[in-house]
């Protein structure tokens, strides 16, 4: 039987497409693929899911969630399961970061109202628990995306400094 972590890792979180141009493409080379010939073009992150991770932590550390829009046609996925996040090496000296996935999962279990006793007793299916974890993850990230978007609208240079994202958490 697969663990909750393994089931969660097979998932691909959703995000609102309005953040693609306003946030994700500002900071990442989303949708371009990765190879050693890519130009960096001043992007802070490589893959779009890296911006998602940042947005998630902004929501988590702010203890704020924002539900995704109900219109499914305005919601997207990266097309890359969580278990694959941070597995690329050698892109501009990057190394893998599997522990970050573990920290995200642990935070979700800690902050999401899931009944692990009911799961252990077999009263609830693992997929239902994973659905709840994904919903929390998406809502935390959605708040974070909105936070980043608002900061950029107020001051397009807000995130230009090297410590800009760090300031968000301090």
Regions flagged by a language model, labelled:
Residues 1-39, 65-170:
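Charged, low-complexity intrinsically disordered terminal regions and linker tails
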